[in-house]
Amino acid sequence: MNNPAQFADQPFNKRIEGMGDLAEGVFEGWCGVNYVRYGLNRPPLAMWKLPLRIRHTPDYLTSDYLVEVQGFGRKQIVQMKLDKWKSLLWWDRNVMPVRLFLHDSHNDRQLMFPIKKLRPLIDNAEVRKFPEGNEYYALSAGEVWSLLG
């Protein structure tokens, strides 16, 4: 039997194929307020050419806040890219409050909270790299749920 590579170990062109679809679908069913799609969803653009703040526009807009959706699974690691973290904090400070919606597909649980509440874990997180070299904070799902759940 052929074991597919873990998500973080797959090349970017494979990761992007379904990136966020499951978690975003769960958010849309879970969210109890009106929302509209706001951020870029795999556009046919050279994303690397776009400014980071545009590239990392939060996924959804509500009347009171923006929402960034992120999923994770079996490894129980929330992988927050360093540049995405900085961009989301900019949106939170300068445009509108940002909430992070996390979907744990392995344990079928969800959590939404103001993005800045993640800072204590970010400040102590291990930095790892995706195969193409992009760095991310590796956050233990258990620690996130203990702190914010």
What are the roles of these predicted feature ranges?
Residues L89-L118:
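Nucleic-acid nuclease catalytic cores
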Residues L45-D59:
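Charged, often glycine-rich, active-site loop that binds/positions anionic groups
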Residues G39, L66-E68, R99-H103:
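A structural signal for short, well-ordered beta-strand segments and their strand-loop junctions
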Residues L111-G149:
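Intrinsically disordered, low-complexity terminal regions enriched in charged/polar residues
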Residues P58-R74:
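Conserved catalytic cores of phosphodiester-cleaving nucleases, focusing on short active-site segments
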Residues G32-V33, T62-Y65, D92-P97:
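Short glycine/proline-enriched coil/turn segments at helix->beta-strand junctions
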Residues M1-K49:
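Acidic-basic catalytic patches of nuclease active cores, encompassing PD-(D/E)XK
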Residues G73-W85:
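Active-site-adjacent loop/helix micro-motif of nuclease/hydrolase catalytic cores
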